[in-house]
């Protein structure tokens, strides 16, 4: 190319400027080529080798010496002076130079030494390329297209450095503890043949959730090649593929079985965390044009179209399982429906305590709970007589995290009458623990807790019931990070025509009755005041009461009572409950199958993240405040992935601060000791963290 440019200029076929434009160089470069050809012939046009002209000084022995000095706490300048190389070469040897500049010939030896530092014990001392191309999977994709591959491609990892999202692999040991993959295999068995099998699909959704993109649409914001590398594939599935796979699972109609299988595994892995189960309803607000039944949304403080769900969490606030509640059903009704499922999760004969708020208030339900072999803990609803001040004592209780709580408590017994169901007329006797708290203007008020547990100290009764807010904390956290309220499917079906819902006309009729009652009372008060004035005239003034006067005063009262009678009759004619079609012919129920599947996946992801955060306890000074933030940072950090004989080494890059890197290193030691395997392979997972850069 250079010789051709010079010859064209010498033949005056083109000018020097035209040749420069044609060959994409500056005019001065064409002139230099002319001078080089004249001075050295064709050999003078051959570009010289860039970079160092000799062999690299960073031999394996020198790189090992640099690593020893770095481990001894020497600075970069001290190491450079001791080894006779530059500080830049020291950084190269320690792997602290950005990978973009490490492909040059002069830095090849430095990159090899830097990436291999500390890995000799694993036999990984060879050069590892930065972001290599994945293993081609075109043949497997072609087989999958014709249905000949079977269920999913096998994960294959390419040794490489600086893989984005390598930190997501930290979640695999904790995810194994949740039992998600095993539960899904138990429920669904083998899914439809394709390149992405059941395990790859579930791992994709879990990794997306942990990367901050829990919805299927989040796959558009995560590079598919980057996510594919941690899946052991050439690329991750796209949004349409994820939706299709979710649709295939939903078509089986076994989402509830998946959640129950996941709950049984949770109970088997953490039986001590299920001594107290917190149950509460959650309103998932629905936005859009579909007509969905309205329900009261506590966080919005007004009714809105919503789907009701009932959630059960352990005593630590970790989600155990959930069910889609029946529309218009109360928490008391849902609790009664959940009792057989709870027994199947905790096992026969085990007596756990079910905790819930006043929404589950029902003496008949209390009898059902204790009759089913459970204990209960709840707040008392409705007015109750205050206890005298002398029965209260100050009690100190230590929580499960060592924090002391002080209460003013009174311990008594309460008998509640049952006014409904087959136990109507019976009574249920419960222990009542009353707490006295400050109120406005220096006053006090009393809050009553009811329980069937007689063995618990009064302070623990109060603390356990207050800990119900851990479930609310999960709702808030999952709404922010795990798309708790997201609409994962646009499918809907007509509402059940045989279902009965409260009639809005009943409310209007009751309001008319209240207005008529108020009008009748006002008319009677006006009549009585007029009669009193006529019967008590001023001194010296005569008063005459005739039938005409009395009838005139009584006429408004009689009219008001007639209005009240008419309102009562009209209200009696209005049915208390009507079919949904009577309110709106287009009333619909949103699809719950896909949502339950995504709930199960995100519950497992959240529990895995929580397990990692708890593992930092004792290794990170601010774990109580920053554990989750550190885990979220670690999950999206880059790192090296090195498959070896029977193992998969994940060597992560350091975090933003040395103290956080040290905490991550302690976490990696725990995860390595767990001996988990990458799903679908026999590769044992090993974790390491690169040392944090030391300023020169």
Located regions from the model:
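Dynamic "connector" segments at or just before major functional cores
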Residues: 1, 114-302, 310-329, 336-345, ...
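Short, Lys/Arg-enriched anionic-surface-contact patches
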Residues: 1-2, 47-62, 190-197
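Short, amphipathic alpha-helical "recognition" segments used to contact nucleic acids or chromatin
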Residues: 1-14, 59-74, 202-210
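Short, conserved catalytic/metal-binding motifs centered on acidic residues
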Residues: 5, 66, 204-205, 219, ...
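Short alpha-helical "recognition helix" segments of helix-turn-helix
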Residues: 17-23, 79-81
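Key DNA-contact positions within bacterial/archaeal DNA-binding proteins
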Residues: 28-31, 88, 240
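An anionic, glycine-rich sequence signature occurring as long contiguous blocks
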Residues: 135-148, 321, 367, 372-471, ...
